[in-house]
């Protein structure tokens, strides 16, 4: 965005892609996924305008990391820097693709950062009412499809004038009240309107890390276009977050003709062509005993 603002005559392509792989039988295994999303940024967008208003909240925490360490050859009995498994350097690097993490601690960090960033953004916008009511849909990072709806309950209560006083963290029953709220008909209706459209693709793809939020945006727009609903002039709220921990909040407004862009995206049609594999094949792929070349693949470019 800054590049295009500084060079309005130019356009930029942003590519978000990643692979979310976790250990077999770990609590993160079911969230695995992979994919990519490409976005075209220009001064005259045909889909959505993004204002230069962002709020960011950060705090240094150690909730997630991918193991990477070095071991000196002399420490494992290799003298004179002899070659070992093709390694010529005096140190051997050990790296593991699957992360070490504490899921519940991460969730606590995410809620803390997103809540702080959300209310910073509300202050930035000088919004006197309920901020999320001004958003047609809420687009959040989805490591699994229901993550956003489960995280957002605290913000939902805190920004609601009738609920804020009843939901105080100092209250010993705060979390039990919050759990009950998340199961209420009122909150379920809110989720169906604000989050469910983004969850459609996530439930079929899984976690894509950096690409996840923008896949949620595409899923939301494809869902509404499928229903024939005109979103011209409507605002989407974006809440990005991640381990480490950080959150960013911003808005996007749909421009006239947005549906013509979305009509070209065969998102759900493509996902319907996905092929199931048996558990044995999955385990072989995960352990790299078998490569993806031996499994039927589907590529999608739009």
Regions found by a protein language model. Give the residues of each.
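Claisen-condensing/thiolase-fold acyl-transfer catalytic domains that form or cleave C-C bonds
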Residues: 1-6, 29, 132, 136-302
